[in-house]
Amino acid sequence: GGAEHVVEVLEPTSEQFAARLRKTAKERRKWARREGVSCYRVYDADLPDYAVAIDVYPGAGDAEGNLYLHIAEYAAPSTIDPGKAQRRYDDVLALAPVVLGVRPDHVFSKVRRRDKGGSQYRDSSRRSYVTQVREDGYLFEVDLVGYLDTGLFLDHRLTRELVGKKAEGKRFLNLFAYTGSASVHAAGGGAKSTATVDLSQTYLDWAARN
């Protein structure tokens, strides 16, 4: 029903990516509304040539028209022509906000290329965009810009849900806990106690805020 957008793509196959994204986004939006989830993954390398993960997050106020995209590119193998991979990724960045109805300046992109030192830690040259998201009645803090990961692994949602269902009356030990989201689910599920352990004080402080 809205205005028609024309996006000039660099690779002809990018039209297939757009069609796939449109289909999966429609399904996931329905699912998110039904489950009461405000952040969710709409695409995860569904097409091998477009190896990106695209997540939808709410902005401040959780308004429908105030959405943000977090797009993470999986580093292409050395057998792929770097120029072709870059053109595909440029097409993803151009098409995704149009297909999903998100403002271009609300798109944050990263490349998932782990350094030996652990590039999940904060790059001091990056700014932050911190907001809160809702999952199963709990609020979690996420940073869409400052780190490689946002603070909440969306593909672990079912595991967190399972923890919450089985936690009642138990003592819950969360090792390599990251930002402690599983501990929140355990506490909410009636755990007798929770212990949250991580090597990073930054993430432990984040877990405490959650």
Regions found by a protein language model. Give the residues of each.
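Conserved SAM/SAH cofactor-binding pocket of Class I
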Residues: K165-N210
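Non-catalytic substrate-recognition/targeting regions of SAM-dependent transferases
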Residues: P48, A53-D55, A85-F153, E161
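Short, surface-exposed beta-strand-loop junctions and turns on beta-sheet-rich folds
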Residues: A60-G61, A75-S78, L148
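Conserved alpha-helix/loop element of class I SAM-dependent methyltransferases that forms part
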Residues: L154-K170
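Residues at the N-termini of beta-strands
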Residues: C39, P104-H106, S193
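A short interface-forming secondary-structure element
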Residues: L67-K84
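Non-catalytic accessory regions of SAM-dependent methyltransferases
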Residues: G1-H70
